[in-house]
Amino acid sequence: MAKFEGLQWASQQLRYMLIEKKGELLASDAKIPAVSRSTNYAIFLCFEGIRFFCKNAAGGGLELHFLNWHKNLERFRRGMAFNLGRDQQGLVPAVSDLESLFIDSYFKAPAMRPFLEEMAGMGAQGYLRPFTVDEEQSIGVTFPNLPSIHAMACRYDQYLGEPFCGVVIPHMVRALGVNKTGWLKLGINYLMSVKAIDEAKRITPDAAAALFLDDQTVRPIEEREITEWDSSCCLFALKDGTVVKIPESPLILPSVTIQGMAIILKGMGVKVEERPFTYGELLRRVKAGELVAAASVGTAGILNRCQKLVLVDNDLKIVATHAPDEGHPLFATLRRAREFYWDIYREKAAPPEGMTLYRYAL
């Protein structure tokens, strides 16, 4: 499975108790109860991944940059709401409250300064990990009694990276549409992600990513729709110059990054189609040489192009293998779109219409 490389955590984490509405800084290795609803049943266990950039500002100050992060915060709110009972919905903070909590109570804390100064000096990629947990020591299968938000920042060198090998895994599904869990960043979804990677390695040992189909397993495999990679969304670049983006649905995490990538590609003159993409169409286009590249798109890695995509049948027998058409203009365009996205954070490129760069002076 994709992993972070060159990871360095901040020395402090934030904890905010939702009932008491009280926040505090804790050491990065602070513990929660070993026995709880969250650790045993994954109840009230949701999270977010939010990219950020920290730069040196005039007068010796620092400035934090986030791109479209209110969408991350709204998605985090939806995950919390899903994990709480009807009578607990009032505990879910507003987007503006989450923004203030993370900026004012965490990033502006004096204890965070050395970490952020080091980041700014390196020009490193930053990643904020907010997550929720029930702080009560309990084994009862109920909604949380002591719900809290934690947040911790890190810097890193890269995530997934190129080249990587992906494998279609048709006999497992990441989430069920009827449960409406696939569009949320929930801990329960990611066990299936790592299990799918384990299955992919049985097919080809160099597998680093698994590509899921939809949950309609009774349909012929060719009629099933592609959903997403194990921990990221996907784009397909076609030889006719079109890029296909899978529509958002209860099976697919609404990626802030892929929404931005679609805007950037359109600004570069690329035709972006948002439509279902069946496995049968993928098979046909691979065999006809009509697929330029399959790409993984997500917060940490931004966009990585798959170097080898292995397609299988219902019996997990390999029926086709795709290698990207590196000579096609779209292959290089995808790389430029990735660089443009990161350049917005660093103020080397202006955000296009539909994308907002948030700046915070520290």
Regions found by a protein language model. Give the residues of each.
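Glycine- and Gly-Pro-enriched alpha-helical subdomains that act as flexible
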Residues: 217-250
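Feature captures the catalytic cores and cofactor-binding loops of soluble hydro-lyases/lyases
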Residues: 255-260
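Short, charged/polar low-complexity linear motifs in solvent-exposed/disordered segments
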Residues: 244-245, 262-264
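Accessory, usually C-terminal, subdomains that scaffold auxiliary metal cofactors
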Residues: 251-254, 284-285
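Conserved alpha/beta cores of soluble small-molecule-handling proteins
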Residues: 1-211, 215-222, 263-362
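Extended, low-hydrophobicity, polar/charged segments
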Residues: 69, 250-251
